[in-house]
């Protein structure tokens, strides 16, 4: 163990690729142990020397191998390659040559400049010392697989079909291969020449957009913190980022690869997928003249005002656009308390036609539809096409001046008002049906009640101010017609007109004015009207008494007739018994008895006592 205390000699570093087993033999053997061999995998690469300088051009070995393909001595080529790579570590266990370089030397050393795959294997085992002991099947699987991969992936090798049947193909050197570092070929599944072309065009377009976006978009200064490029922060064709919108400097972009930069919020349009609409990139900068803007504003304002005026006018007037009937009810008519006369009675006088409607002065703008001075129709906007309310003739029902106008006049008026809005009529069909139902109900109520018949002959003027005090002279009534109407109902209707009710109700009786003397007093008119009403009531009572008497007489006659019928029945029974008692008599006697039986007896026979 004393030998371990001695200093170990400094072993020289090997730069020419010598094996470590050669260096181990120089170790001192004083320690009493023999040198041990070490596996080849642990012998390389050798450590670099301290004064090692990395060569500038690393392609010298490849260039030398490609330029010396024609030389027939492979050993000289290998020495030249080793000399070019002096003072550098070995790349592989056999030296600085790659598998592609070894295959190139093997094919170039052949006479026909072509070798099969098995011949390349043999050349490797024979000429490269590293593969001499690796020719068996167990240890050659790895490096033979590497040779096959290099043959298929490098452009410098070309496969040629063998003429003989059942033989492997030839491998030759491609004369069109570029000198220098060879480019690896892609597999057949990755042959995407079309994709490469499209990607090249996309790159050019990205560069153009990048330059145009940086220069033209409002001269915006790009953020210095962008990792890919400043121009990609702008999206000139995006509708969300018009005007040169710039992303926040805190936005972290992805790596600057083609896939990643095109995949995130890509401003690049897909090629041949979107139609070209002809819009320029800076279409957002297009402006409109001031005159065009004013015309558009005026057009929009006039349309809005017209629609608003039409809707307001229809709502104020109570019209429905579809039916032309008023949607709001007329002002309610509230007459004083009145009793209703039986249906079918009308008191007519010879002078009722003298009550004519007085013309209204032109200064008062009374609404013809609602008969009101403060109607909302007068405060609305002017009627379309210069139509005035006076030019529309409406026919009111004389029985109720404040009621709704007739359907013909309202349709005429609504058609003129709704000349420009006929398209909106279909939206109000439901309102039309509701108004038609209401109109039918009102007509039925007016026709079924006594007011609808008695008030048809009234004046179309307001009847709120109609009073007995305004009339002078006597009141006349056609009593005969009244009595005839009573007799038509066989006396089943009763007339009961209280005096107080007649004095307060003037809507159910048609009054006439036979005097034009306006200077007479109200007291005289009231007294004369009261006298005539008393006479009318007395006549009606007399008529009722006469009817009662007639009814009593008819009742008595009916009683007499019933008594006579009873007597006749008794006589018939006695005749039948008499006939049964004389059945043994002759046929003539039977005939006499049968002849004595009357079929219809109106009076007792003379022989019955």
From Swiss-Prot:
Residues 327-339 have a biased composition (Pro residues). The keyword Iron does not apply. SUPFAM superfamilies: Winged helix' DNA-binding domain. SMART domains: FH. GO terms for biological process: cell differentiation; glucose homeostasis; negative regulation of cell growth; negative regulation of cell population proliferation; negative regulation of insulin receptor signaling pathway; regulation of DNA-templated transcription; regulation of lipid metabolic process. InterPro entries: Fork_head_dom, TF_fork_head_CS_2, WH-like_DNA-bd_sf, WH_DNA-bd_sf. GO terms for cellular component: cytoplasm; nucleus. Keywords: Activator, Cell cycle, Cytoplasm, Developmental protein, Differentiation, DNA-binding, Growth regulation, Nucleus, Phosphoprotein, Transcription, Transcription regulation. Residues 62-79, 220-229, 254-263, 388-397 have a biased composition (Polar residues). The keyword Cell inner membrane does not apply. Residues 94-200 bind DNA. Its main location: cytoplasm. One of its GO terms (molecular function) is RNA polymerase II cis-regulatory region sequence-specific DNA binding. Gene3D superfamilies: Winged helix-like DNA-binding domain superfamily/Winged helix DNA-binding domain. Interacts with melt. This is Forkhead box protein O. It comes from Drosophila virilis (Fruit fly).
């Amino acid at each position: 163990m004393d030998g371990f205390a001695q200093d170990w000699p400094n072993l020289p570093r090997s730069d020419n690729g010598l094996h470590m087993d050669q260096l181990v033999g120089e170790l001192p053997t004083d320690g009493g142990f023999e040198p041990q061999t070490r596996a080849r995998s642990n012998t390389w690469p050798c450590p670099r020397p301290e004064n090692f300088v990395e060569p500038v051009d690393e392609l010298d070995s490849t260039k030398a191998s490609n330029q010396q393909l024609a030389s027939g001595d492979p050993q000289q080529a290998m020495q030249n390659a080793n000399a070019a790579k002096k003072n550098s570590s070995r790349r592989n266990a056999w030296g600085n040559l790659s598998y592609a370089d070894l295959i190139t030397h093997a094919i170039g050393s052949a006479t026909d400049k072509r070798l099969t795959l098995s011949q390349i294997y043999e050349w490797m085992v024979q000429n490269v010392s590293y593969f001499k002991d690796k020719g068996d099947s167990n240890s050659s699987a790895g490096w033979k697989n590497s040779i096959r991969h290099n043959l298929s992936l490098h452009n410098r090798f070309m496969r040629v079909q063998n003429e003989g049947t059942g033989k492997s193909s030839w491998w030759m050197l491609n004369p069109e291969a570029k000198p220098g570092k060879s480019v690896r070929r892609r597999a057949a599944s990755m042959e995407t020449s079309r994709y490469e072309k499209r990607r090249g065009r996309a790159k050019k377009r990205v560069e153009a957009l990048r330059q145009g976006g940086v220069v033209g978009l409002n001269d915006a200064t790009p953020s210095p913190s962008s990792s890919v490029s400043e121009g990609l922060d702008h999206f000139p064709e995006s509708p969300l980022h018009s005007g040169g919108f710039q992303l926040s400097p805190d936005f972290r972009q992805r790596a600057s690869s083609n896939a990643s930069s095109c995949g995130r919020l890509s401003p690049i349009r897909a090629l041949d997928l979107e139609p070209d609409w002809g819009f320029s990139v800076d279409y957002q900068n297009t402006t409109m003249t001031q005159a065009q803007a004013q015309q558009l504003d005026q057009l929009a304002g006039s349309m809005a005002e017209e629609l608003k005026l039409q809707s307001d006018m229809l709502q104020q007037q109570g019209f429905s656009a579809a039916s032309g009937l008023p949607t709001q009810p007329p002002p309610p008519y509230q007459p004083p308390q009145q009793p209703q006369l039986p249906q079918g009675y009308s008191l007519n006088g010879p002078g009722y036609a003298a009550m004519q409607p007085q013309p209204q002065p032109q200064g008062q703008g009374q609404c013809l539809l609602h008969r009101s001075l403060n109607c909302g129709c007068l405060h609305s906007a002017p009627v379309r096409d210069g139509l005035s309310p006076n030019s529309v003739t409406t026919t009111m029902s004389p029985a109720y001046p404040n009621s709704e106008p007739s359907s013909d006049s309202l349709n005429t008026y609504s058609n003129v008002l709704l000349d420009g809005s006929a398209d909106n009529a279909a939206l109000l069909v439901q309102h039309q049906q509701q108004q038609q139902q209401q109109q039918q109900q009102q007509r039925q109520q007016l026709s079924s009640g006594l007011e609808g018949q008695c008030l048809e002959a009234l004046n179309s003027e307001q009847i709120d101010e109609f009073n007995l005090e305004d009339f002078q002279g006597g009141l006349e009534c056609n009593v005969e017609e009244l009595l005839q109407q009573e007799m038509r109902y066989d006396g089943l209707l009763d007339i009961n007109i209280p005096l107080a009710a007649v004095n307060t109700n003037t809507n159910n009786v048609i009054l006439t004015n036979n005097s034009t003397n306006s200077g007479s007093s109200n007291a005289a008119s009231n007294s004369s009207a009261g006298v005539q009403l008393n006479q009318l009531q007395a006549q009606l009572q007399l008529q009722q008494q006469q009817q009662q008497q007639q009814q009593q007489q008819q009742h008595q006659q009916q009683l007499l007739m019933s008594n006579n019928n009873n007597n006749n029945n008794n006589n018939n029974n006695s005749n039948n018994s008499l006939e049964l008692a004389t059945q043994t008599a002759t046929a003539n006697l039977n005939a006499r008895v049968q002849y004595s039986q009357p079929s219809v007896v109106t009076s007792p026979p003379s022989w019955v006592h």
